[in-house]
Amino acid sequence: MSKFLFTAAAIVFLSCAPAQAADKPENFLPPDALDLTAILPPPPANDSPVTRAELAEIHRVQAGASAAQNAQAKADTQEDAYVFASVLGANFTAGKLPAAAPFLEHVREAEKEFVDPAKKALGRPRPPLVDSTIATCETLRPSGAYPSGHATTGYLFAVVLAQIVPEKREQIFSRAAEYANNRVLCGVHYPSDVEAGKISGSLIGAMLLQNPAFKAELGPAKAEIRRVLGLPSQ
């Protein structure tokens, strides 16, 4: 899947380049810059062998989880950049980043812009709506399951934060994977939802890296984050 993820990112990056220039003030990218329903494989049908196998996998993951893993999955219902504080340090908080915090929220809006329409169009019900014996670590959200918004957000922020703190690139992506996979443990996503989210976040991140408005905001945000984290300027 990782090979497909980066191959897909490269393909979509090239195909979407012209649309990226049409930046909108409220978002880095225009709504028509990316149609995830045209890129992602369709989700498995509710009564398919794949879905049945995924439901069994959710049960297996939940049965084997420790108390600490369950607590982390619960904590990871939070959906913002600061879930990476475990990698970047205790100073990585909105309160200590007055300049970077709005930038990071601006980045997160890109996930909503592209994932929300895809969820609505694809309409995959969340696992407990198909198998009521699956427990969840949060109140079930009304949005569709595919692709996972949390997984998209995690990988989108991983792409961006790896540009800001390249020294911790490996740890950042490891944390993104943990964060994304915890949606399965939480019982609110199938594994294929999470994989689709990883692809989506990587695609959106690749597009942002080429966006002029994003790059204009990245510089000051990077400078502040590195200063607050006690890292040398770049």
Q: Regions from the language model: what does each represent?
A:
Residues 22-185, 217:
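Hydrophobic alpha-helical bundle signature of multipass membrane enzymes
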Residues 1-6:
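Bacterial N-terminal signal peptides that target proteins for export
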Residues 7-15:
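Bacterial N-terminal signal peptides
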Residues 17-21:
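Sec/Tat signal peptide C-region and signal peptidase I cleavage site
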